[in-house]
Design a protein with these regions (language model features):
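AAA+/P-loop NTPase substrate/partner-engagement loops
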Residues: 54-80
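Pre-Walker A (pre-P-loop) alpha-helix and adjacent loop at the N terminus of AAA/AAA+ ATPase modules
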Residues: 2-34
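Conserved Walker
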Residues: 29-31, 85-90, 121-136, 150-151, ...
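Conserved AAA+ ATPase "SRH/arginine-finger" region at the nucleotide-binding site
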Residues: 62-67, 143-144, 158-160, 171-185
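Walker A/P-loop
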Residues: 30-62
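Conserved AAA+/SF3 P-loop NTPase catalytic/coupling segment centered on the Walker-B
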Residues: 69-73, 92-120, 137-138, 145-152, ...
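Conserved AAA+ ATPase small/helical "lid" subdomain
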Residues: 170-188, 192-223
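Conserved RecA-like P-loop NTPase ATPase core
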Residues: 13, 21, 45, 52, ...
Length: 223
């Protein structure tokens, strides 16, 4: 667990959220589940990747907007024509996995309900009576949005269902903050390979007025 303190070096500007995550690991046994919400490009995906790195776990990202229909459940968890499901084949090879359920709010209700059961039971039994164990899995569910949106104030049926099914089941709900101008400058300085397009989108998302050309010149002078 001491390795997890390194997360603050990778995830800049989210000290409170990282502290909540480390505390959860100190007091809870696997499987562990987190729900992380916040604006775009604030570190949600990077958190899952870095967590897998420091735990020495396999990393798997599922984009849940690909699972909006109920039939997509079979591709995810059911064996079809003797072909193992995505999660069965992954967890058979890598029982210790950090599983990122990205944009969890876009998944169909059947999948949300199913994962809420997995959080309770620690396993899933498919139609062929094969058990998929999730006992050594770290779940990270992510959603882009503000606290009012993600915590159930948004009048959407899907968000209400998500709140009802999952929020009482997850071990920790973490809010990530928008990145300040100073943090973004630090990220750019530390990661010189970051694309100009990504920087532009990040600044636009956070409504931060900044002279990008001037900043890049300053960074080159500092290097």
């Amino acid at each position: 667990l001491s390795q997890l303190k390194q997360l603050n070096k990778d995830i800049l500007g989210q000290e409170k959220g990282i502290h909540q995550m480390i505390e959860t690991f100190q007091h809870k046994q696997l499987p562990i589940s987190f729900f992380i919400y916040g604006p775009t490009s604030c570190g949600k995906t990077l958190t899952a990747k870095s967590l897998a790195k420091y735990l020495n776990y396999h990393y798997l990202k599922l984009d849940m907007n690909q699972y909006q229909e109920s039939h997509s459940l079979y591709k995810l968890l059911e064996t079809y024509h003797e072909k193992p499901s995505l999660l069965l084949s992954t967890l058979q090879s890598y029982p210790h996995t950090v599983l990122l359920l990205d944009h969890i709010d876009q998944a169909c209700e059947e999948i949300i309900h199913l994962f809420s059961q997995i959080f309770d039971d620690g396993y899933y039994e498919d139609q062929a009576k094969r058990k998929i164990s999730f006992e050594n899995v770290v779940f990270i569910m992510s959603q882009t949005g503000t606290s009012r949106c993600c915590m159930g104030f948004k009048k959407s049926r899907q968000t209400k269902y998500l709140k009802h099914e999952l929020f009482d089941k997850v071990d920790q709900i973490i809010e990530y903050q928008p990145l300040s101008k100073e943090i973004i400058e630090k990220i750019i300085h530390l990661r010189e390979h970051i694309s100009i397009e990504k920087i532009h989108n990040l600044l636009k998302e956070e409504h931060i007025p900044i002279n990008l050309s001037k900043m890049m010149k300053q960074i080159k002078q500092m290097s």
